[in-house]
């Protein structure tokens, strides 16, 4: 049994009616998932895996600084810088064995995570209908993108000098274009959504094995809603 002391600090300073700064600092922890700590073998579609009962929880020390600009109540431009120190990070590894299976380890004493994130929500036009029609015609878009740097010196890894953390994609981007037509008690919303995630490490290679890379992907979806 382990006791956790988890302090948290959040500060906000309004530079003006439309500009604000936020500072956050906290300590959190990550417990191993059931499949990561269970000693039983799991048979998957692509890989078999087995948990590690000796895994330790990860301690996370987080700091972020955020600037918000609200041109209007429904619009936003935001920029965030963040840093995280992780003690005893948990990662999936490939075990050198005849059966070839994946397991989980506290892969390093510590790991660092740093990055920036930008978010934009903008109205391209907002046109009220006539007072008799009681409605609105609105076109808007949203953009969210981030770059994440991760690094850890891993004694168990094939490349011990430093590697990305498992599951952390360096580049992530999301974009949506939405048309909202409202008239009386009825509304029609059509949204085009684009998402991109870059290549990321699926499994960290050990004992001569190379890292297994999960290929990045792009998706494009169209969502229509009426009520």
Model-predicted regions and their roles:
Residues 1, 34-40, 47-48, 89-97, ...:
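Outer-membrane beta-barrel translocator domains and adjoining extracellular loop/strand segments
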Residues 2-5, 13, 57, 110, ...:
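Conserved structured core elements
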Residues 4, 62, 125-130, 183, ...:
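Subset of outer-membrane beta-barrel
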Residues 7-15, 19-27, 63-71, 75-83, ...:
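Membrane-embedded beta-strands that build the outer-membrane beta-barrel scaffold
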Residues 24, 34-36, 184-186:
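Surface-exposed loop/interface segments of Gram-negative outer-membrane beta-barrel transport/assembly proteins
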Residues 29-86, 96-127, 168-171, 213-216:
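Outer-membrane beta-barrel signature, preferentially recognizing the C-terminal barrel domain
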Residues 81-85, 102-200:
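Gram-negative outer-membrane beta-barrel transporters
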């Amino acid at each position: 049994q382990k006791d956790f002391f988890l302090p948290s600090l959040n500060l906000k300073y309004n530079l003006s009616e439309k500009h604000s700064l936020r500072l956050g600092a906290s300590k959190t922890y990550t417990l191993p998932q059931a499949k990561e700590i269970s000693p039983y073998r799991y048979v998957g579609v692509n890989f078999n895996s087995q948990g590690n009962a000796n895994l330790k929880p990860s301690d996370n020390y987080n700091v972020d600084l955020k600037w918000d600009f609200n041109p209007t109540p429904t619009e936003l431009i935001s920029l965030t810088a963040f840093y995280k120190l992780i003690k005893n990070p948990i990662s999936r590894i490939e075990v050198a064995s005849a059966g070839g299976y994946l397991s989980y380890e506290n892969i390093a004493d510590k790991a660092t995570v740093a990055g920036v994130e930008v978010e934009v929500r903008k109205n391209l036009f907002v046109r009220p209908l006539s007072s008799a029609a009681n409605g609105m015609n609105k076109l808007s878009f949203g953009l969210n993108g981030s770059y994440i740097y991760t690094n850890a010196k891993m004694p168990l890894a094939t490349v011990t000098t430093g590697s990305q953390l498992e599951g952390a994609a360096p580049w992530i981007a999301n974009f949506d274009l939405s048309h909202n037509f409202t008239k009386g008690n009825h509304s029609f919303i059509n949204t085009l959504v684009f998402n991109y995630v870059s290549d990321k490490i699926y499994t960290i290679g050990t004992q001569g094995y190379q890292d297994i890379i999960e290929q990045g992907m792009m998706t494009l979806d169209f969502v229509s809603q009426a009520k």
